Amino acid sequence: MTDRQPLISKNDDIINNLTRFYTELTEFEKIIKDVGTGRDTTTLRSTLHKKKVNLADDLKVIAQQIKQLPSSKLPKFQQEKIVKQFKEASSKFEELLSTSNKKESSHEPIVPSQQQQQQQNNGNSNNNGYNTRGGYNQQQQQQQQQYNDYTNNNNNNNNNEVEQYNRLEQALKSGIEQDEEEYTNRILDERNANARQIARDVAMLKEAMDDIAVMVGEQGEMLEKVDDNVTNADVAVEDAVVELEKAYVYKSSYRKKMIIFVICLLVTLVAVGIFLAIYYGVIKKK
């Protein structure tokens, strides 16, 4: 946690500085629009000069922070976005600087009446005939020359920094392209692995379908055999019913015969008994 917090703070500082720089650029652009108008006073020119210096200093601070981006743990696409925003801000600042220099050289600032009167009085009391307007112009030219030298040095430094940022951006892009290539290759490998897995699954499914087809064929044969057995059993049942009917008829006939036989036997026994009784009865009487 202690190592992570400073990193987040630095990254937030870069974003905050860029945001503030864009805001100051907007204010700088508004001031430039007032150059050559009725609001173009010496105070405005002084504010404009301070704004230039502050923006140049802020640009250097942001440049130093961006140089430390590769060592941060920010994703590369975020680093690239920050570098891109910085380049756009630098280009916008250089464009506004060029516009400001052209407008300042084309227009003279308006001197307030009280300050102009005081400068005229000082000029009249001066023995060498110093002209207030000319002295101010000379002073303004000296300040402009000093600022131009400062701006040229800053532009040279900015150009060197822009080259470094271009190299940094190219390195980031190459790293991102490499990451994208690795990511694409990883996706392709995963897709190929999935395709191979699908092919294996399809092969296994085909084998399972073949096994099911064989089982269905075997079951079909078994069903045919079962159907034959059922048919045979049905025939056997019908035959058994016929046999049972025959057996029932035979049993009924046999029962009738047995009854007749028993009746005949009883009649015979009764007749024999009567005969014996008569026979023995007659013999005993004699």
From Swiss-Prot:
SUPFAM superfamilies with a match to the protein in the record: t-snare proteins
UniProt entry tagged with the keyword rRNA-binding: no
One cellular component (GO) term of this entry: endosome
Disordered: annotated span: 97-160
Domain of life: Eukaryota
Biased composition (Low complexity): 114-160
Basic and acidic residues compositional bias, start-end: 97-107
Membrane-spanning residues: 258-278
Topology feature Vesicular, residues: 279-286
A GO molecular function held by the record: SNARE binding
Family: Belongs to the syntaxin family.
PANTHER family: SYNTAXIN, SYNTAXIN-7B-RELATED
Annotated protein name in UniProt: Probable syntaxin-7B
Gene name in the database record: syn7B
